């Protein structure tokens, strides 16, 4: 069974497969090796990937992107509140969970972020199955290193909705390190810093790679934003410039804003290789054209603070790994935003002018590593990967709430996983019969500032003064980093409680996942019906045009009655096609059958009775340049 590796990105996604001893990044149906993480809904169909992004300016309110910024978060998350300002689509609260509200087939529909992500995953799964010629169910999906438990589990849920068995969720910089280590066939021990600045998130990881096969993550740090924020700065600047020049605020118009964002994204890419980018948009707002230039220096000034922010996680990762700058041997850049020259200069300056490694494709490295890990987990015995061992770390500290709402950390951030840690606690008051254990993840001192994962009660504690009972709390994290077993045991009585934390806060219930799986199947059937409708329409249209072309070429072979019948039938069909936006497949087939019954005898008569004439006509056309000769008009040159 083939397993694929998927880099589910904020703005673009990429996937690959390890086979025949190497990784192959799979191109989508448009021939592109990255697929926009976009899903669009129209009054007739659902579009995913390139097709969705290509029509975004025409349909901004019903084209969804950035689902990764919503996944696993609560609606009232401050970061979501900030992001909503930049999105043309509507985000609503459903029991505290964010849902995306769109118009689909003239009905209002609400989708969870997991559903939108699952649609992108489904698109990649289907493409992989076509290319590989086999059913694909197993996959490794990557997430930013700084994703919390809710976000990781929600990503796993998206995979399940898409019909995938998610073998493992791995960190993006770790996957990139796998790609680098295997690609370079390293010898000896090397400390590698992965600087991953993508379309929506930012991660830094430090790994030690031993003999190109043992990959040990030493520390990880990051920011679940950045990347696309550069676009936002440029869009704001251009919108302000437009307002200053023409005294009109285009930000009130979603379509104009989307067109401006597309142009800004293109300009940002241009500025990575040129010192100036030209932005030209016809009739951007109220018939006014936008024509302006943006220099690289201006762009760097607009994003200066964001660029500087990228160095903070670098310093944090170095401190956590207990390493000095000089101990890093290689600096690997991953993610499209690392192409920005200012980012490269800042990082190079931070590391005292040492050269950066730009040798791996920043758009594909994460998917490459995910494909390798997928092959390993699915039991591939290829010599290239048989010795590869990946040792990751817990991205966030795990602990419990103690008196006063203070977080007591049991597993520290950047602790190697799998790991198991135990600490002893006691009661807060005299004769306390039980304790409520609340499990959190995060780095803040107070639990209210961290992310609650779950809670359970340990009862049956024998009466005793406060501080006397000894309660052992054990945290056990598996190699995936997303299965956490927590146990508590009162030592004198032996009473114990053991649970597996399943973070339901902000997550989908099993019933919701089952419903979404069924809906995904229904949407896939609707998509197939839509494809069949379009194919039937195209067949009918092609047939009508072919008939018209044939009889106009050989019109002298038809009687007046036949000419009239064919002309009327073809014209009526073309009018019907123009007036009917999208009928049922059966209607197209009925029209096709009716037209075929009328035209087939006439077409047969044309071709049987007019074969010589048709040949002569073609001969005259072909021979128009050489005095009517029907021989070839070109000659082979030695």
From Swiss-Prot:
Entries under CDD domains matching the protein: ASKHA_NBD_HSP70_HSPA1
GO terms of molecular function: ATP binding; ATP-dependent protein folding chaperone
Keyword Aminoacyl-tRNA synthetase listed: no
Induction text: By heat shock.
Origin superkingdom: Eukaryota
Keywords noted in UniProt: ATP-binding, Nucleotide-binding, Stress response
Family of this protein: Belongs to the heat shock protein 70 family.
This protein's name: Heat shock protein 70
Organism name: Ceratitis capitata (Mediterranean fruit fly)
């Amino acid at each position: 069974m083939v397993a694929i590796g998927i880099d589910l990105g904020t703005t673009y996604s990429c996937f690959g497969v390890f086979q025949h001893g190497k990784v192959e990044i799979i191109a989508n149906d448009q021939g592109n090796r990255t697929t926009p993480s976009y899903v669009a809904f129209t009054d007739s169909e659902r579009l995913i990937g390139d097709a969705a992004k290509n029509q975004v300016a025409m349909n901004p309110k019903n084209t969804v992107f950035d689902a990764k910024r919503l996944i696993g978060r609560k609606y009232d998350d401050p970061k979501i509140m900030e992001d909503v300002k930049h999105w043309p689509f509507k985000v609503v609260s459903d029991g505290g969970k964010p849902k995306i509200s769109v118009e689909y087939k003239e009905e209002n529909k609400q989708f969870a972020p997991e559903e939108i992500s699952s649609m992108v995953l489904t698109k990649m799964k289907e493409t992989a199955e076509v290319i590989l010629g086999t059913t694909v169910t197993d996959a490794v999906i990557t997430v930013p290193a700084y994703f919390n438990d809710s976000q990781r589990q929600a990503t796993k849920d998206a995979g399940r909705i898409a019909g995938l068995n998610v073998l493992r969720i791995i960190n993006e910089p770790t996957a990139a390190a796998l790609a680098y280590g295997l690609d370079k066939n390293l010898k000896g021990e090397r400390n590698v810093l992965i600087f991953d600045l993508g379309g929506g998130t930012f991660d830094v990881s430090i790994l030690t790679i031993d003999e190109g096969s043992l990959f040990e993550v030493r520390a990880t740090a990051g920011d679940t934003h950045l990347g696309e924020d550069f676009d936002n700065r440029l869009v704001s600047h251009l919108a302000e410039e437009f307002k200053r020049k023409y005294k009109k605020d285009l930000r009130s118009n979603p379509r104009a804003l989307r067109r401006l964002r597309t142009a800004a994204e293109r300009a940002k890419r241009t500025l990575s290789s040129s010192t100036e980018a030209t932005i030209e948009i016809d009739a951007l707002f109220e018939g006014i054209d936008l024509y302006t230039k943006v220099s690289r220096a201006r762009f760097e000034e607009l994003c200066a603070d964001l660029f500087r922010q990228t160095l903070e996680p670098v310093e944090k990762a170095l401190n956590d790994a207990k390493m000095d700058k000089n101990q890093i041997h290689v600096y690997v850049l991953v993610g499209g935003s690392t192409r920005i020259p200012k980012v490269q200069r800042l990082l190079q300056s931070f590391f005292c002018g040492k050269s950066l490694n730009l040798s791996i494709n920043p758009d594909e490295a994460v998917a490459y590593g995910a494909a390798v890990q997928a092959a390993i987990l699915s039991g591939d015995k290829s010599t290239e990967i048989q010795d590869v061992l990946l040792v990751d770390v817990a991205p966030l500290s795990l602990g419990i709430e103690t008196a006063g709402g203070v977080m007591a950390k049991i597993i520290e951030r950047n602790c190697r996983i799998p790991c198991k840690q135990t600490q002893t606690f006691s009661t807060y008051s005299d004769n306390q019969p039980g304790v409520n254990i609340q499990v959190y993840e995060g780095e803040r001192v107070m639990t209210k500032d961290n992310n609650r994962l779950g809670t359970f009660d340990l009862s049956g504690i024998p009466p005793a003064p406060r501080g006397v009972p000894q309660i052992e709390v054990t945290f056990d994290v598996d190699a995936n980093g997303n299965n956490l077993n927590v146990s508590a045991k009162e030592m004198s009585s032996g009473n114990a409680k053991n649970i597996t934390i399943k973070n339901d806060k902000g997550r989908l219930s099993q019933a919701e996942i089952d419903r979404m799986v069924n809906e995904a199947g229904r949407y896939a059937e609707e998509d197939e019906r839509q494809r069949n409708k379009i194919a039937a329409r195209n067949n009918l249209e092609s047939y009508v045009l072919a008939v018209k072309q044939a009889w106009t070429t050989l019109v002298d072979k038809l009687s007046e009655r036949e000419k009239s019948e064919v002309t009327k039938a073809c014209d009526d069909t073309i009018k019907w096609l123009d007036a009917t936006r999208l009928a049922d497949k059966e209607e197209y087939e009925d029209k096709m059958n009716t037209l075929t019954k009328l035209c087939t005898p006439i077409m047969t008569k044309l071709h049987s009775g007019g074969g010589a004439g048709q040949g002569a006509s073609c001969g005259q056309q072909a021979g128009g340049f050489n005095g009517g000769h029907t021989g070839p008009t070109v000659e082979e040159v030695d």
